Amino acid sequence: MMTPKSAVLGLCLGLSAFAAAGSAYAGPAVSTRWRESEMSQDECFHYAEIAIQAAGFSRIERTTQSCYGTRGDYTAAIRCIIDHKVIFFIVAGPSLEQAPKYLHDIYDHF
């Protein structure tokens, strides 16, 4: 027979396991900004590479619309959607405090 004391102990253990599992499965911190732009795709990529490198990111790569870089556990991306006159700035990594700081640095260098 379960006593109230063992029921409370079981509930506490279950809640602890649930909290630990939630932390283990937490996703990365993602910080974003955007701005309108009239620049060309080539200009956007040029400034994107400069901004990402100036913020201390390396291993710069390009896709058809985006420029990426890495800095430790963080990834930065600048997506140039020139057809819609929009540029997206994205930084993802493990810290909710650091990701926005890196994003601000990249945005300011663009």
Identify the meaning behind each predicted range.
Residues 15, 33-34, 88:
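Generic anion/oxyanion-binding catalytic loop in active/binding sites
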Residues 23-55:
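Terminal, regulation- and interaction-focused segments at domain boundaries
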Residues 29, 57, 83-87:
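A broad structural signal for short, well-ordered beta-strand segments within beta-sheet-rich domains
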Residues 50, 56-75:
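A cross-family detector of function-defining hotspots
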